[in-house]
Amino acid sequence: MNQTRVFLIFAWLMVAVLLWMEWSREKAAPTPAPTTTSAPAAAQSVPGANPGAIPSAQVPGAPGQAAAQAQASATPASQRVTVTTDVLRLVLDGGRVLDAELLQFPQTKDEGSPPVRLLTEDPAHPYSAISGWASEDRNTPVPGADGFKLVGDTKDFVLAKGQNELQIPFVWTADNGVTIKRTLTVSRNEYAVRFKDEVSNAGAAPWNGYVYRTLDRTPTILSRSMTNPDSFSFNGATWYDNDKKYQRRAFKDYLEDGTLNQNITGGWLAMLQHHFFTAWIPQKDQTAHYVLSQVAGRDLIEARGPAFTVAPGQSTSTEARLWVGPKLVNLIAKEDVPGLDRVVDYSRFSMMAVIGQGLFWVLNQVHKLVGNWGWAIVGLVVLLKLVLYPLSATQYKSGAKMRRFQPRIAQLKERYGDDRQKFQTAMMELYKKEKINPMGGCLPILIQMPIFFALYWVLVESVELRQAPWFGWIQDLTARDPYFILPVINVAVMWFTQKLTPAPGMDPMQQKMMQFMPLVFGVMMAFMPSGLVLYWVVNGGLGLLQQWWMTKRHGGEPVPATTAPAPVKKK
Protein backbone atom coordinates (compact mmCIF):
# COMPACT_ATOMS: atom_id res chain seq x y z
CA MET A 1 0.00 0.00 0.00
CA ASN A 2 1.48 3.38 -1.00
CA GLN A 3 1.12 6.66 0.86
CA THR A 4 -1.39 8.07 -1.59
CA ARG A 5 -3.75 5.19 -0.96
CA VAL A 6 -3.27 5.53 2.78
CA PHE A 7 -4.12 9.22 2.50
CA LEU A 8 -7.11 8.40 0.29
CA ILE A 9 -8.42 5.77 2.69
CA PHE A 10 -7.96 8.08 5.66
CA ALA A 11 -9.74 10.93 3.89
CA TRP A 12 -12.69 8.85 2.75
CA LEU A 13 -12.91 7.26 6.19
CA MET A 14 -13.40 10.72 7.65
CA VAL A 15 -16.04 11.52 5.06
CA ALA A 16 -17.81 8.23 5.80
CA VAL A 17 -17.80 8.89 9.56
CA LEU A 18 -19.24 12.37 9.14
CA LEU A 19 -21.88 11.17 6.68
CA TRP A 20 -22.81 8.35 9.05
CA MET A 21 -23.21 10.88 11.86
CA GLU A 22 -25.46 12.97 9.64
CA TRP A 23 -27.50 9.96 8.50
CA SER A 24 -28.00 8.66 12.03
CA ARG A 25 -29.33 12.02 13.15
CA GLU A 26 -31.64 12.43 10.18
CA LYS A 27 -32.93 8.90 10.64
CA ALA A 28 -33.78 9.51 14.28
CA ALA A 29 -37.23 10.73 15.20
CA PRO A 30 -37.10 14.30 16.46
CA THR A 31 -38.88 13.45 19.71
CA PRO A 32 -39.95 10.21 21.38
CA ALA A 33 -43.45 9.03 20.64
CA PRO A 34 -45.80 10.02 23.47
CA THR A 35 -46.64 7.23 25.86
CA THR A 36 -48.74 7.21 28.98
CA THR A 37 -47.79 5.59 32.25
CA SER A 38 -50.56 5.07 34.75
CA ALA A 39 -50.05 5.35 38.48
CA PRO A 40 -49.21 2.04 40.16
CA ALA A 41 -51.90 0.12 41.95
CA ALA A 42 -51.94 0.11 45.73
CA ALA A 43 -50.84 -3.51 45.74
CA GLN A 44 -47.59 -2.54 44.02
CA SER A 45 -45.72 -1.51 47.11
CA VAL A 46 -42.16 -0.60 47.93
CA PRO A 47 -40.67 -2.76 50.70
CA GLY A 48 -39.08 0.12 52.64
CA ALA A 49 -37.08 -1.11 55.58
CA ASN A 50 -34.03 0.05 57.51
CA PRO A 51 -31.98 3.08 56.49
CA GLY A 52 -30.15 2.33 53.28
CA ALA A 53 -32.85 0.06 51.85
CA ILE A 54 -34.08 0.94 48.39
CA PRO A 55 -37.43 0.72 46.62
CA SER A 56 -38.25 -2.45 44.74
CA ALA A 57 -37.35 -2.73 41.09
CA GLN A 58 -40.87 -4.01 40.47
CA VAL A 59 -42.50 -0.64 41.11
CA PRO A 60 -43.01 1.41 37.97
CA GLY A 61 -43.66 4.48 40.10
CA ALA A 62 -42.76 7.97 39.00
CA PRO A 63 -42.96 11.39 40.60
CA GLY A 64 -46.67 11.35 39.83
CA GLN A 65 -47.12 8.54 42.37
CA ALA A 66 -45.60 10.58 45.16
CA ALA A 67 -47.62 13.64 44.16
CA ALA A 68 -50.81 11.59 44.30
CA GLN A 69 -49.93 10.39 47.79
CA ALA A 70 -49.24 13.95 48.87
CA GLN A 71 -52.83 14.96 48.06
CA ALA A 72 -53.88 13.25 51.30
CA SER A 73 -51.78 15.84 53.11
CA ALA A 74 -52.45 19.55 52.97
CA THR A 75 -50.63 20.51 49.77
CA PRO A 76 -50.05 24.28 49.80
CA ALA A 77 -50.79 26.50 46.85
CA SER A 78 -47.96 27.14 44.41
CA GLN A 79 -45.16 29.02 46.16
CA ARG A 80 -42.74 30.29 43.58
CA VAL A 81 -39.34 31.27 44.87
CA THR A 82 -36.65 33.03 42.86
CA VAL A 83 -32.99 32.50 43.77
CA THR A 84 -30.29 34.62 42.14
CA THR A 85 -26.54 34.18 42.52
CA ASP A 86 -23.63 35.51 40.49
CA VAL A 87 -23.99 32.60 38.04
CA LEU A 88 -27.56 31.25 38.40
CA ARG A 89 -31.15 32.41 38.49
CA LEU A 90 -33.50 29.65 39.67
CA VAL A 91 -37.27 29.41 39.99
CA LEU A 92 -38.38 26.92 42.66
CA ASP A 93 -41.82 25.56 43.46
CA GLY A 94 -41.75 23.23 46.45
CA GLY A 95 -39.53 20.32 45.49
CA ARG A 96 -39.25 21.34 41.85
CA VAL A 97 -36.65 23.46 40.09
CA LEU A 98 -38.74 24.76 37.21
CA ASP A 99 -36.44 27.27 35.58
CA ALA A 100 -32.68 27.84 35.53
CA GLU A 101 -30.82 30.61 33.72
CA LEU A 102 -27.03 30.60 33.38
CA LEU A 103 -26.22 34.27 33.85
CA GLN A 104 -22.65 34.13 32.55
CA PHE A 105 -23.59 32.38 29.30
CA PRO A 106 -25.56 34.55 26.84
CA GLN A 107 -27.38 32.69 24.10
CA THR A 108 -25.58 34.68 21.39
CA LYS A 109 -22.79 37.24 21.18
CA ASP A 110 -25.27 40.02 20.40
CA GLU A 111 -25.41 42.81 22.95
CA GLY A 112 -28.28 42.29 25.38
CA SER A 113 -28.69 38.61 24.49
CA PRO A 114 -30.63 36.73 27.20
CA PRO A 115 -28.80 34.04 29.17
CA VAL A 116 -28.97 30.35 28.34
CA ARG A 117 -32.04 28.79 29.94
CA LEU A 118 -31.15 25.21 30.86
CA LEU A 119 -34.29 24.29 32.82
CA THR A 120 -37.48 25.75 31.43
CA GLU A 121 -41.27 25.81 31.73
CA ASP A 122 -41.66 26.12 27.96
CA PRO A 123 -44.93 24.21 27.33
CA ALA A 124 -43.51 22.61 24.18
CA HIS A 125 -40.29 21.38 25.81
CA PRO A 126 -40.49 21.52 29.62
CA TYR A 127 -37.35 20.51 31.51
CA SER A 128 -37.24 20.33 35.32
CA ALA A 129 -35.39 18.80 38.25
CA ILE A 130 -37.53 17.25 40.99
CA SER A 131 -36.87 15.97 44.50
CA GLY A 132 -39.61 14.57 46.73
CA TRP A 133 -40.57 11.80 49.12
CA ALA A 134 -42.78 8.73 48.65
CA SER A 135 -43.68 5.74 50.83
CA GLU A 136 -44.35 2.04 50.56
CA ASP A 137 -47.72 2.59 52.16
CA ARG A 138 -50.16 4.77 50.23
CA ASN A 139 -51.79 5.67 53.55
CA THR A 140 -48.54 7.08 54.92
CA PRO A 141 -48.43 10.86 54.60
CA VAL A 142 -45.55 12.10 52.44
CA PRO A 143 -44.76 15.48 50.90
CA GLY A 144 -44.19 14.25 47.38
CA ALA A 145 -42.50 17.09 45.52
CA ASP A 146 -45.24 19.67 46.09
CA GLY A 147 -45.81 19.52 49.84
CA PHE A 148 -42.83 21.60 50.97
CA LYS A 149 -43.71 25.05 52.31
CA LEU A 150 -41.30 27.97 52.29
CA VAL A 151 -40.22 29.09 55.75
CA GLY A 152 -40.69 32.85 56.10
CA ASP A 153 -42.14 35.45 53.78
CA THR A 154 -39.16 36.05 51.48
CA LYS A 155 -39.91 34.94 47.93
CA ASP A 156 -36.91 36.52 46.21
CA PHE A 157 -33.48 35.41 47.42
CA VAL A 158 -30.39 37.23 46.12
CA LEU A 159 -26.76 36.43 46.91
CA ALA A 160 -25.49 39.83 48.02
CA LYS A 161 -22.09 41.27 47.21
CA GLY A 162 -19.54 39.88 49.64
CA GLN A 163 -21.85 37.01 50.57
CA ASN A 164 -20.54 33.55 49.68
CA GLU A 165 -23.53 31.38 50.58
CA LEU A 166 -27.30 31.58 50.62
CA GLN A 167 -29.78 29.16 52.20
CA ILE A 168 -33.44 28.70 51.28
CA PRO A 169 -35.46 26.82 53.96
CA PHE A 170 -38.55 24.69 53.36
CA VAL A 171 -40.57 22.47 55.67
CA TRP A 172 -43.29 19.84 55.51
CA THR A 173 -45.20 18.69 58.59
CA ALA A 174 -47.71 15.83 58.76
CA ASP A 175 -50.54 15.39 61.25
CA ASN A 176 -48.81 12.29 62.66
CA GLY A 177 -45.87 14.37 63.93
CA VAL A 178 -43.40 13.71 61.10
CA THR A 179 -41.48 16.74 59.88
CA ILE A 180 -39.11 17.06 56.94
CA LYS A 181 -36.93 20.16 56.89
CA ARG A 182 -35.36 20.87 53.53
CA THR A 183 -32.51 23.35 53.11
CA LEU A 184 -31.24 24.42 49.70
CA THR A 185 -27.79 26.01 49.67
CA VAL A 186 -26.32 27.97 46.77
CA SER A 187 -22.78 29.36 46.74
CA ARG A 188 -20.83 31.99 44.86
CA ASN A 189 -19.40 30.86 41.50
CA GLU A 190 -20.94 27.39 41.90
CA TYR A 191 -23.47 25.57 39.74
CA ALA A 192 -24.10 22.83 42.32
CA VAL A 193 -27.22 23.42 44.45
CA ARG A 194 -27.04 21.47 47.71
CA PHE A 195 -30.20 19.77 49.01
CA LYS A 196 -30.38 18.57 52.61
CA ASP A 197 -33.49 16.82 53.97
CA GLU A 198 -33.81 16.20 57.73
CA VAL A 199 -36.59 13.83 58.78
CA SER A 200 -37.83 13.96 62.40
CA ASN A 201 -40.53 11.74 63.92
CA ALA A 202 -42.32 13.27 66.91
CA GLY A 203 -45.23 10.86 66.54
CA ALA A 204 -46.08 7.58 68.22
CA ALA A 205 -45.48 5.19 65.29
CA PRO A 206 -42.57 4.48 62.94
CA TRP A 207 -42.60 6.36 59.64
CA ASN A 208 -41.42 4.76 56.39
CA GLY A 209 -40.44 6.73 53.32
CA TYR A 210 -37.89 7.11 50.57
CA VAL A 211 -36.50 10.08 48.71
CA TYR A 212 -36.53 10.30 44.92
CA ARG A 213 -34.61 12.61 42.61
CA THR A 214 -35.70 13.04 39.01
CA LEU A 215 -34.77 14.81 35.80
CA ASP A 216 -37.86 15.26 33.64
CA ARG A 217 -37.57 16.55 30.07
CA THR A 218 -39.36 16.74 26.76
CA PRO A 219 -36.35 16.85 24.42
CA THR A 220 -35.87 19.88 22.23
CA ILE A 221 -36.14 19.27 18.50
CA LEU A 222 -32.70 19.89 16.99
CA SER A 223 -31.89 21.02 13.47
CA ARG A 224 -30.03 17.85 12.63
CA SER A 225 -27.28 18.88 10.26
CA MET A 226 -23.52 18.91 9.94
CA THR A 227 -23.87 22.70 9.88
CA ASN A 228 -25.38 22.70 13.40
CA PRO A 229 -22.72 22.07 16.11
CA ASP A 230 -25.44 21.42 18.72
CA SER A 231 -26.45 18.28 16.85
CA PHE A 232 -22.88 16.95 16.95
CA SER A 233 -22.92 16.46 20.72
CA PHE A 234 -24.60 13.67 22.63
CA ASN A 235 -28.14 14.55 23.73
CA GLY A 236 -29.63 12.19 26.27
CA ALA A 237 -29.44 10.70 29.75
CA THR A 238 -26.29 9.37 31.38
CA TRP A 239 -25.52 7.65 34.65
CA TYR A 240 -22.51 6.29 36.48
CA ASP A 241 -21.82 3.49 38.92
CA ASN A 242 -18.61 2.06 40.28
CA ASP A 243 -19.07 -1.29 38.52
CA LYS A 244 -20.28 -0.51 35.00
CA LYS A 245 -18.85 3.00 35.01
CA TYR A 246 -20.20 5.57 32.56
CA GLN A 247 -23.32 4.69 30.58
CA ARG A 248 -25.65 6.71 28.40
CA ARG A 249 -28.94 6.60 26.50
CA ALA A 250 -29.80 9.00 23.67
CA PHE A 251 -33.20 10.69 23.65
CA LYS A 252 -33.91 9.34 20.17
CA ASP A 253 -33.92 5.72 21.40
CA TYR A 254 -34.55 6.31 25.09
CA LEU A 255 -36.16 3.01 26.09
CA GLU A 256 -34.76 0.89 23.27
CA ASP A 257 -32.53 -1.04 25.70
CA GLY A 258 -35.01 -1.18 28.56
CA THR A 259 -35.79 0.92 31.64
CA LEU A 260 -32.43 0.43 33.39
CA ASN A 261 -33.75 -0.84 36.80
CA GLN A 262 -30.34 -0.88 38.47
CA ASN A 263 -29.25 -0.47 42.10
CA ILE A 264 -26.31 1.93 42.33
CA THR A 265 -24.25 3.06 45.31
CA GLY A 266 -22.34 6.31 45.07
CA GLY A 267 -23.36 7.02 41.49
CA TRP A 268 -25.03 9.93 39.75
CA LEU A 269 -27.47 10.61 36.92
CA ALA A 270 -27.57 13.40 34.36
CA MET A 271 -29.05 14.75 31.16
CA LEU A 272 -26.55 16.12 28.66
CA GLN A 273 -26.71 18.52 25.75
CA HIS A 274 -24.15 20.57 23.85
CA HIS A 275 -21.97 22.46 26.37
CA PHE A 276 -24.40 22.12 29.33
CA PHE A 277 -25.86 19.47 31.63
CA THR A 278 -28.06 18.83 34.65
CA ALA A 279 -27.19 16.15 37.20
CA TRP A 280 -28.38 14.71 40.49
CA ILE A 281 -25.47 13.59 42.67
CA PRO A 282 -26.62 11.63 45.77
CA GLN A 283 -24.44 10.90 48.78
CA LYS A 284 -21.51 8.59 48.03
CA ASP A 285 -22.44 6.08 50.75
CA GLN A 286 -26.13 5.75 49.91
CA THR A 287 -27.79 3.33 47.49
CA ALA A 288 -30.61 4.19 45.12
CA HIS A 289 -32.57 2.41 42.42
CA TYR A 290 -32.06 4.04 39.01
CA VAL A 291 -34.89 3.97 36.48
CA LEU A 292 -35.52 5.32 32.98
CA SER A 293 -39.12 5.98 31.97
CA GLN A 294 -41.34 7.90 29.57
CA VAL A 295 -44.54 9.64 30.63
CA ALA A 296 -46.73 11.41 28.07
CA GLY A 297 -43.82 12.09 25.74
CA ARG A 298 -41.46 13.17 28.53
CA ASP A 299 -38.17 11.39 29.18
CA LEU A 300 -37.32 10.78 32.83
CA ILE A 301 -34.31 9.43 34.67
CA GLU A 302 -34.78 8.91 38.38
CA ALA A 303 -32.91 7.74 41.49
CA ARG A 304 -35.29 6.23 44.09
CA GLY A 305 -33.92 5.83 47.56
CA PRO A 306 -32.54 5.28 50.01
CA ALA A 307 -35.59 4.34 52.07
CA PHE A 308 -35.75 5.12 55.78
CA THR A 309 -37.65 3.81 58.78
CA VAL A 310 -37.69 6.58 61.38
CA ALA A 311 -38.70 5.42 64.84
CA PRO A 312 -40.63 7.68 67.23
CA GLY A 313 -38.34 10.29 68.73
CA GLN A 314 -35.65 9.65 66.12
CA SER A 315 -34.38 11.57 63.09
CA THR A 316 -32.30 10.99 59.98
CA SER A 317 -31.05 12.98 57.02
CA THR A 318 -30.02 12.65 53.40
CA GLU A 319 -28.17 15.02 51.06
CA ALA A 320 -27.69 15.46 47.34
CA ARG A 321 -26.32 17.99 44.89
CA LEU A 322 -28.11 19.27 41.81
CA TRP A 323 -25.75 20.55 39.12
CA VAL A 324 -27.35 22.98 36.70
CA GLY A 325 -24.72 24.51 34.48
CA PRO A 326 -21.96 24.32 31.89
CA LYS A 327 -19.46 21.53 31.28
CA LEU A 328 -16.60 23.53 32.81
CA VAL A 329 -13.84 21.04 33.51
CA ASN A 330 -12.23 22.89 36.42
CA LEU A 331 -15.51 23.40 38.32
CA ILE A 332 -16.62 19.81 37.71
CA ALA A 333 -13.31 18.57 39.13
CA LYS A 334 -13.89 20.59 42.33
CA GLU A 335 -17.04 18.56 43.05
CA ASP A 336 -14.82 15.49 43.57
CA VAL A 337 -17.39 13.04 42.19
CA PRO A 338 -16.10 9.80 40.60
CA GLY A 339 -16.78 9.75 36.87
CA LEU A 340 -18.45 13.16 36.72
CA ASP A 341 -15.74 14.35 34.33
CA ARG A 342 -17.31 12.03 31.72
CA VAL A 343 -20.20 14.47 31.24
CA VAL A 344 -17.74 16.32 29.02
CA ASP A 345 -18.59 13.64 26.52
CA TYR A 346 -15.51 13.28 24.31
CA SER A 347 -16.54 9.69 23.57
CA ARG A 348 -18.58 6.82 24.94
CA PHE A 349 -15.38 4.73 24.71
CA SER A 350 -13.07 5.03 27.70
CA MET A 351 -9.82 5.06 25.71
CA MET A 352 -10.97 7.88 23.43
CA ALA A 353 -12.34 9.79 26.42
CA VAL A 354 -8.97 9.51 28.19
CA ILE A 355 -7.17 10.79 25.08
CA GLY A 356 -9.66 13.66 24.86
CA GLN A 357 -9.19 14.57 28.52
CA GLY A 358 -5.43 14.56 28.08
CA LEU A 359 -5.62 16.76 24.99
CA PHE A 360 -7.88 19.25 26.75
CA TRP A 361 -5.50 19.37 29.72
CA VAL A 362 -2.65 20.31 27.37
CA LEU A 363 -4.89 22.79 25.54
CA ASN A 364 -5.86 24.38 28.86
CA GLN A 365 -2.21 24.69 29.95
CA VAL A 366 -1.33 26.41 26.69
CA HIS A 367 -4.32 28.72 27.14
CA LYS A 368 -3.03 29.75 30.55
CA LEU A 369 0.18 30.88 28.86
CA VAL A 370 -1.25 32.67 25.82
CA GLY A 371 -4.65 33.78 27.14
CA ASN A 372 -6.48 33.06 23.87
CA TRP A 373 -8.19 29.81 22.91
CA GLY A 374 -7.42 30.28 19.21
CA TRP A 375 -3.70 30.63 19.83
CA ALA A 376 -3.97 27.77 22.33
CA ILE A 377 -5.20 25.55 19.47
CA VAL A 378 -2.22 26.66 17.37
CA GLY A 379 0.12 25.92 20.29
CA LEU A 380 -1.44 22.50 20.83
CA VAL A 381 -0.90 21.59 17.17
CA VAL A 382 2.75 22.66 17.41
CA LEU A 383 3.25 20.52 20.53
CA LEU A 384 1.58 17.52 18.89
CA LYS A 385 3.80 17.95 15.84
CA LEU A 386 6.89 17.98 18.06
CA VAL A 387 5.79 14.89 19.98
CA LEU A 388 4.87 13.01 16.81
CA TYR A 389 7.89 14.23 14.85
CA PRO A 390 9.78 10.89 14.98
CA LEU A 391 6.76 9.15 13.43
CA SER A 392 6.23 11.94 10.91
CA ALA A 393 9.91 11.87 9.96
CA THR A 394 9.64 8.16 9.19
CA GLN A 395 6.56 8.83 7.09
CA TYR A 396 8.12 11.70 5.14
CA LYS A 397 11.44 9.91 4.60
CA SER A 398 9.56 6.96 3.16
CA GLY A 399 7.56 9.31 0.94
CA ALA A 400 10.68 11.15 -0.23
CA LYS A 401 12.38 7.91 -1.19
CA MET A 402 9.31 6.69 -3.04
CA ARG A 403 9.11 9.99 -4.90
CA ARG A 404 12.74 9.60 -5.97
CA PHE A 405 11.91 6.29 -7.65
CA GLN A 406 8.80 7.57 -9.40
CA PRO A 407 10.44 7.39 -12.88
CA ARG A 408 11.27 3.70 -12.38
CA ILE A 409 7.76 2.93 -11.17
CA ALA A 410 6.29 4.75 -14.15
CA GLN A 411 8.54 2.67 -16.44
CA LEU A 412 7.32 -0.54 -14.77
CA LYS A 413 3.71 0.52 -15.26
CA GLU A 414 4.34 1.22 -18.92
CA ARG A 415 6.14 -2.09 -19.37
CA TYR A 416 3.43 -4.29 -17.85
CA GLY A 417 0.41 -2.28 -19.02
CA ASP A 418 -2.85 -3.72 -17.71
CA ASP A 419 -1.24 -6.73 -16.05
CA ARG A 420 -1.72 -5.51 -12.47
CA GLN A 421 -0.34 -8.66 -10.85
CA LYS A 422 2.99 -8.52 -12.70
CA PHE A 423 3.24 -4.78 -12.12
CA GLN A 424 2.69 -5.17 -8.37
CA THR A 425 5.23 -8.01 -8.21
CA ALA A 426 7.84 -5.98 -10.06
CA MET A 427 7.19 -2.93 -7.89
CA MET A 428 7.60 -4.96 -4.69
CA GLU A 429 10.88 -6.36 -6.01
CA LEU A 430 12.03 -2.79 -6.63
CA TYR A 431 11.04 -1.79 -3.10
CA LYS A 432 12.92 -4.76 -1.68
CA LYS A 433 16.05 -4.07 -3.72
CA GLU A 434 16.16 -0.35 -2.86
CA LYS A 435 15.09 -0.94 0.79
CA ILE A 436 11.90 1.08 0.47
CA ASN A 437 9.19 0.35 3.01
CA PRO A 438 5.83 1.02 1.29
CA MET A 439 4.11 0.73 4.67
CA GLY A 440 6.37 3.36 6.23
CA GLY A 441 3.69 6.01 5.97
CA CYS A 442 0.87 3.88 7.38
CA LEU A 443 1.82 3.58 11.06
CA PRO A 444 2.13 7.33 11.73
CA ILE A 445 -1.28 7.96 10.16
CA LEU A 446 -2.90 5.10 12.09
CA ILE A 447 -1.46 6.40 15.36
CA GLN A 448 -2.60 9.94 14.62
CA MET A 449 -6.17 8.93 13.73
CA PRO A 450 -7.43 8.45 17.33
CA ILE A 451 -5.68 11.68 18.32
CA PHE A 452 -7.43 13.56 15.52
CA PHE A 453 -10.87 12.16 16.34
CA ALA A 454 -10.38 12.81 20.07
CA LEU A 455 -9.26 16.36 19.34
CA TYR A 456 -12.30 16.83 17.11
CA TRP A 457 -14.58 16.08 20.07
CA VAL A 458 -12.48 18.24 22.39
CA LEU A 459 -13.01 21.24 20.13
CA VAL A 460 -16.72 20.47 19.65
CA GLU A 461 -17.50 19.67 23.30
CA SER A 462 -15.45 22.24 25.25
CA VAL A 463 -17.73 24.97 26.55
CA GLU A 464 -14.58 26.96 27.32
CA LEU A 465 -14.32 27.65 23.57
CA ARG A 466 -17.98 28.72 23.28
CA GLN A 467 -18.14 32.27 21.86
CA ALA A 468 -14.35 32.57 22.40
CA PRO A 469 -12.61 34.75 19.78
CA TRP A 470 -9.31 34.13 18.01
CA PHE A 471 -8.52 37.38 16.21
CA GLY A 472 -9.82 39.46 13.32
CA TRP A 473 -12.83 37.90 11.66
CA ILE A 474 -12.95 34.81 13.93
CA GLN A 475 -14.98 35.92 16.94
CA ASP A 476 -16.45 32.53 17.91
CA LEU A 477 -14.35 29.39 17.65
CA THR A 478 -17.44 27.17 17.93
CA ALA A 479 -19.16 28.85 14.96
CA ARG A 480 -18.27 28.52 11.28
CA ASP A 481 -15.88 30.95 9.61
CA PRO A 482 -18.22 33.76 8.46
CA TYR A 483 -16.10 34.56 5.39
CA PHE A 484 -14.86 30.99 4.61
CA ILE A 485 -11.23 32.17 4.72
CA LEU A 486 -9.92 29.25 6.79
CA PRO A 487 -11.69 26.62 4.62
CA VAL A 488 -10.17 28.16 1.47
CA ILE A 489 -6.69 28.11 3.06
CA ASN A 490 -7.33 24.51 4.02
CA VAL A 491 -8.13 23.60 0.40
CA ALA A 492 -4.87 25.22 -0.74
CA VAL A 493 -2.83 23.39 1.91
CA MET A 494 -4.37 20.05 0.94
CA TRP A 495 -3.76 20.71 -2.76
CA PHE A 496 -0.06 21.45 -2.23
CA THR A 497 0.25 18.44 0.08
CA GLN A 498 -1.28 16.28 -2.62
CA LYS A 499 1.28 17.56 -5.13
CA LEU A 500 4.13 16.57 -2.81
CA THR A 501 2.68 13.14 -2.08
CA PRO A 502 4.15 10.32 -4.19
CA ALA A 503 1.59 8.37 -6.19
CA PRO A 504 3.20 5.22 -7.58
CA GLY A 505 0.96 3.08 -9.70
CA MET A 506 -2.19 5.17 -9.38
CA ASP A 507 -4.85 4.41 -11.96
CA PRO A 508 -6.85 7.24 -13.63
CA MET A 509 -9.84 6.75 -11.31
CA GLN A 510 -7.68 7.20 -8.21
CA GLN A 511 -6.07 10.27 -9.74
CA LYS A 512 -9.48 11.85 -10.34
CA MET A 513 -10.56 11.06 -6.80
CA MET A 514 -7.41 12.65 -5.43
CA GLN A 515 -7.96 15.79 -7.51
CA PHE A 516 -11.41 16.27 -5.99
CA MET A 517 -10.37 15.45 -2.41
CA PRO A 518 -9.27 18.99 -1.40
CA LEU A 519 -12.52 20.40 -2.75
CA VAL A 520 -14.61 17.78 -0.90
CA PHE A 521 -12.85 18.61 2.36
CA GLY A 522 -13.15 22.33 1.66
CA VAL A 523 -16.93 22.12 1.32
CA MET A 524 -17.17 19.93 4.42
CA MET A 525 -14.99 22.22 6.54
CA ALA A 526 -16.81 25.36 5.37
CA PHE A 527 -19.65 24.74 7.82
CA MET A 528 -17.71 23.23 10.70
CA PRO A 529 -16.63 25.13 13.85
CA SER A 530 -13.83 27.54 12.97
CA GLY A 531 -11.74 26.21 15.86
CA LEU A 532 -11.70 22.78 14.23
CA VAL A 533 -10.85 24.25 10.82
CA LEU A 534 -8.07 26.30 12.45
CA TYR A 535 -6.62 23.09 13.87
CA TRP A 536 -6.84 21.42 10.46
CA VAL A 537 -5.19 24.36 8.66
CA VAL A 538 -2.30 24.66 11.13
CA ASN A 539 -1.81 20.90 11.29
CA GLY A 540 -1.87 20.60 7.50
CA GLY A 541 0.37 23.64 7.01
CA LEU A 542 3.03 22.37 9.40
CA GLY A 543 2.77 18.93 7.82
CA LEU A 544 3.25 20.47 4.38
CA LEU A 545 6.40 22.29 5.56
CA GLN A 546 7.72 19.11 7.16
CA GLN A 547 7.06 17.11 4.01
CA TRP A 548 8.68 19.74 1.76
CA TRP A 549 11.77 19.89 3.98
CA MET A 550 12.07 16.10 4.25
CA THR A 551 11.63 15.71 0.50
CA LYS A 552 14.33 18.28 -0.13
CA ARG A 553 16.68 16.72 2.41
CA HIS A 554 16.16 13.01 1.77
CA GLY A 555 14.64 12.84 -1.69
CA GLY A 556 17.75 13.37 -3.79
CA GLU A 557 17.70 13.36 -7.57
CA PRO A 558 15.08 11.18 -9.27
CA VAL A 559 16.43 7.82 -10.42
CA PRO A 560 16.35 7.87 -14.26
CA ALA A 561 13.78 5.69 -15.95
CA THR A 562 16.48 4.34 -18.25
CA THR A 563 17.70 2.14 -15.44
CA ALA A 564 16.64 -1.41 -16.10
CA PRO A 565 13.62 -2.37 -14.11
CA ALA A 566 13.78 -5.05 -11.49
CA PRO A 567 13.31 -8.54 -12.93
CA VAL A 568 10.04 -10.29 -12.41
CA LYS A 569 10.34 -13.71 -10.81
CA LYS A 570 8.26 -16.31 -12.54
CA LYS A 571 6.55 -18.87 -10.42
Swiss-Prot record:
GO BP terms, alphabetized: protein insertion into membrane; protein transport
Transmembrane domains' residue ranges: 4-24, 369-389, 440-460, 483-503, 518-538
Organism superkingdom: Bacteria
Compositionally biased tracts (Low complexity): 34-43, 55-78
Membrane topology: Multi-pass membrane protein
GO molecular function: membrane insertase activity
Keyword terms of this UniProt record: Cell inner membrane, Cell membrane, Chaperone, Membrane, Protein transport, Transmembrane, Transmembrane helix, Transport
Subcellular location: Cell inner membrane
Disordered as annotated region, ranges: 29-78
Any one Gene Ontology cellular component term annotated for this protein: plasma membrane
Keyword Flavoprotein found: no
Assembly, per entry: Interacts with the Sec translocase complex via SecD. Specifically interacts with transmembrane segments of nascent integral membrane proteins during membrane integration.
Function recorded in the entry: Required for the insertion and/or proper folding and/or complex formation of integral membrane proteins into the membrane. Involved in integration of membrane proteins that insert both dependently and independently of the Sec translocase complex, as well as at least some lipoproteins. Aids folding of multispanning membrane proteins.
Similarity field: Belongs to the OXA1/ALB3/YidC family. Type 1 subfamily.
NCBIfam families documented for this protein: PRK01318.1-3, yidC_nterm, yidC_oxa1_cterm
Protein name: Membrane protein insertase YidC
Gene that this sequence comes from: yidC
